[in-house]
């Protein structure tokens, strides 16, 4: 009885994988591939053509994870599902269609170089070895247990094309050895990946080929060979023109010249941060001829002493203008402080108060107006038109208000913010919108994933969900506008904490976050109230960690955050509200100001309805997946919960002491 397989494949490696399955006697039930993109230079073999030659059914669905395709694949009842350089992630329901295993062939020695374009990245980074890995597919990309690997050496003269040929041959050898064993045994031993060694690299774009002459010559040489033909090439501006470098060599000397200075034109040799680069081949502009380095020097008029500079770079660089509505709020004031530490930003902010930003108002690149977003619409529209990036941070985000003032929550959080989003559409401005972990509602996933987790809320009579659905609806509106060209990023904070989170006065009327309420009880000597026993778990994130992630989203290196949703939370800092209260108490008792406050009055368990009123409903856990944050902005949180609690407690105790001083 033959072994049945469904194959997802593209590129040369896809052809190699499919041919290896045929050679090993597998029955190919169906093949899924991609239609070639006319904008992409097609230098590789065609899976579709190979299928046609063998009479194999081939498909190119836009979404292979669509229930219709999953159902069809399930009916095929494959023993195995294989993925060979297929460019879309296969979901759990699709992978479950394989009776024995779902396996992927990845072009690196996992766990290193997970992600996109590993052959290019290993060259960029100057590696001397890579390889191919056959591994089990799991929900996370390239993270499943390893079935087989084959190593490939990288020579100093390898380019992306020659290395791809080596990887293609290695893949053929590995599959020739592995596939017959797999068919005979049904399973092969698999070794879990060592997560401590894992690295992830994202998609490369033509813009990544920009040459920075301040870097060492060896680093630039590695970039050039990583993106030379058939890829778009490494390039640099020369005056108003573009020089694409196809081939080069390294000279260890720079003759003492500044980076970017032409040392000679025969050969064309340019000083770098360390050493110099000899350009041996390239072209002028995207449609120019392939020329030698010496002819390029003549084409561009380069002589010894010339500077490889972009005219635009010679002019002063304008700071990025960032509009923050709700600048006095918890995120707004911390974000402003962080961006002002970087001289690349100019902040324009509006809020109805200014107590949290007084420390920033004297800074030359900080501009503040006191105002209400529902009233000062002309000022807002003008500044959206004027600025580059817009962050509408104004919202009611305290749970008691969801049941106490649901219409006000909807009016402010949805209606007023929708106006701002539409101004961003009108003036083609990038919007970075604060979604919320609340949108996941009662999702049952162990870790909430931005792209796959269902957003589940309670019945209409549970009004606490009005905040969640207001935010979710705006997320969906922004996403829809994004399909029509709006530049956006949605970020979802998971229980950020730190100084200036709230005010004790807000806690006194119940309109604050959980930790502020707990601290107020300690300050006033009243029992700490644990709603429904405090068993609910949350993942608490230090505001310093959170703001660093947000700053990277604003920076948006290589446009990686465009059109993305990014959870910003710390899954390692999960604690129940009771545990939060207990740690607060421990640090409170040890604090130098402890003697100024009443004795601890104990914990008291209360029902949620008596605390929040009718219409409240809670969730047991809220744990983020931060894979998107890791791969898109290279972010992982690092501050432990106990440190965050200590900083937050200290801030509020000092606020309480200041209140006492004012009353004297």
From Swiss-Prot:
Q: Where are the active-site residues found?
A: 106, 438, 622
Q: In which pathway does it act?
A: Nucleotide-sugar biosynthesis; UDP-4-deoxy-4-formamido-beta-L-arabinose biosynthesis; UDP-4-deoxy-4-formamido-beta-L-arabinose from UDP-alpha-D-glucuronate: step 1/3; Nucleotide-sugar biosynthesis; UDP-4-deoxy-4-formamido-beta-L-arabinose biosynthesis; UDP-4-deoxy-4-formamido-beta-L-arabinose from UDP-alpha-D-glucuronate: step 3/3; Bacterial outer membrane biogenesis; lipopolysaccharide biosynthesis
Q: Could you cite one Gene Ontology molecular function of this protein?
A: UDP-4-amino-4-deoxy-L-arabinose formyltransferase activity
Where does the chain cross the membrane?
A: none
NADP as a keyword of this entry, yes or no, is: no
Q: Where is this region: Formyltransferase ArnAFT?
A: 1-308
Give the binding site residues for UDP-alpha-D-glucuronate.
397, 402, 436-437, 464, 495, 529-538, 616
* Disulfide bond sites: none
> Which EC number(s) does UniProt give?
2.1.2.13, 1.1.1.305
Give the InterPro entries listed for this entry: Arna-like_SDR_e (IPR045869), Bifun_polymyxin_resist_ArnA (IPR021168), Epimerase_deHydtase (IPR001509), Formyl_trans_C (IPR005793), Formyl_transf_N (IPR002376), Formyl_transf_N_sf (IPR036477), Formyl_transferase-like_C_sf (IPR011034), Lipid_A_modif_metabolic_enz (IPR050177)
- UniProt protein name: Bifunctional polymyxin resistance protein ArnA
Q: Which organism is it from?
A: Pseudomonas syringae pv. syringae (strain B728a)
- Taxonomic classification, please? Bacteria, Pseudomonadati, Pseudomonadota, Gammaproteobacteria, Pseudomonadales
What is the gene called? arnA
């Amino acid at each position: 009885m033959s072994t049945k397989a469904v194959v997802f494949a593209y590129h040369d490696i896809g052809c190699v994988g499919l041919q290896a399955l045929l050679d090993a006697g597998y029955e190919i039930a169906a093949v899924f591939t991609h239609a070639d993109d006319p904008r992409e230079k097609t230098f590789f073999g065609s899976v579709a053509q190979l299928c046609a030659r063998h009479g194999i059914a081939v498909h190119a669905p836009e979404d292979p994870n669509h229930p219709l395709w999953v159902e069809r694949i399930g009916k095929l009842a494959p023993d195995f599902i294989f993925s060979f350089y297929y460019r879309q992630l296969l979901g759990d329901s699709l992978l479950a269609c394989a009776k024995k295993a779902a396996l992927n062939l990845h072009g690196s020695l996992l766990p290193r170089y997970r992600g996109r374009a590993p052959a290019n990245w290993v060259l960029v980074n100057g590696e001397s070895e890579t390889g191919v890995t056959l591994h089990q597919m799991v929900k996370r990309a390239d993270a499943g247990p390893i079935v087989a690997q084959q190593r490939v050496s990288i020579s100093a003269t390898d380019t992306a094309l020659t290395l791809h040929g080596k990887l293609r041959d290695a893949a053929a050898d590995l599959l020739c050895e592995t596939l017959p064993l797999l068919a005979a045994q049904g399973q092969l031993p698999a070794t879990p990946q060592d997560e401590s060694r894992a690295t992830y690299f994202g998609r490369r774009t033509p813009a990544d080929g920009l040459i920075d002459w301040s870097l060492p010559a060896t680093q630039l040489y590695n970039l050039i060979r990583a993106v030379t033909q058939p890829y778009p090439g490494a390039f640099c501006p020369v005056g108003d023109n573009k020089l694409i470098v196809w081939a080069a060599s390294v000279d260890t000397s720079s003759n003492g010249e500044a980076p970017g200075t032409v040392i000679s034109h025969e050969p064309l040799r340019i000083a770098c941060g360390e050493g110099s680069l000899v350009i041996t081949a390239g072209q002028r502009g995207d449609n120019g001829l392939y020329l030698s380095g010496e002819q390029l020097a003549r084409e561009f008029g380069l002589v010894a002493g010339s500077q490889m500079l972009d005219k635009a770079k010679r002019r002063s660089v304008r700071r990025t203008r960032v509009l923050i509505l709700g600048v006095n709020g918890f995120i707004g004031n911390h974000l402003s402080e962080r961006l002002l530490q970087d001289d690349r930003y100019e902040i324009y902010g509006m809020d109805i108060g200014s107590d949290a930003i007084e420390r920033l108002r004297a800074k030359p690149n900080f501009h503040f107006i006191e105002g209400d977003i529902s009233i000062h619409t002309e000022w807002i529209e003008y500044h959206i038109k004027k600025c580059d990036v817009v962050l509408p941070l104004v919202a009611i985000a305290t749970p008691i208000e969801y049941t106490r003032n649901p219409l006000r929550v909807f009016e402010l959080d949805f209606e007023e913010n929708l106006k701002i989003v539409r101004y961003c559409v009108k003036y083609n401005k990038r919007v970075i919108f604060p979604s919320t972990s609340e949108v996941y509602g009662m999702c049952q996933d162990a870790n909430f994933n931005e792209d796959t987790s269902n957003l589940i809320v309670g019945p209409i009579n549970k009004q606490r969900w009005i905040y969640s659905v207001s935010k979710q609806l705006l997320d969906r509106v922004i996403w829809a506008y994004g399909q029509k060209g709006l530049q956006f990023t949605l970020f979802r904070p998971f229980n950020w904490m730190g100084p200036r989170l709230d005010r004790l006065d807000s806690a006194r009327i119940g309109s604050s976050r959980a930790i502020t309420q707990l601290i107020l009880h300690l300050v006033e000597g009243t029992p700490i109230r644990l709603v429904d026993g405090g068993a609910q778990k949350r993942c608490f994130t230090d505001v310093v960690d959170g703001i660093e992630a947000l700053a990277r989203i604003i920076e948006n290196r290589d446009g990686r955050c465009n059109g993305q949703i990014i959870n910003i939370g710390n899954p390692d800092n999960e604690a129940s509200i009771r545990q939060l209260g207990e740690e607060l108490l421990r640090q409170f008792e040890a604090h130098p100001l402890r003697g100024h406050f009443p004795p601890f009055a104990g914990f008291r368990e209360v029902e949620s309805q008596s605390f929040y009123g009718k219409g409240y409903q809670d969730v047991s856990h809220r744990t983020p997946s931060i894979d998107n944050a890791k791969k898109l902005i290279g972010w992982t949180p690092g501050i432990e919960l106990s440190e965050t609690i200590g900083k937050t407690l200290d801030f509020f105790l000092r606020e309480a002491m200041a209140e006492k001083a004012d009353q004297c």
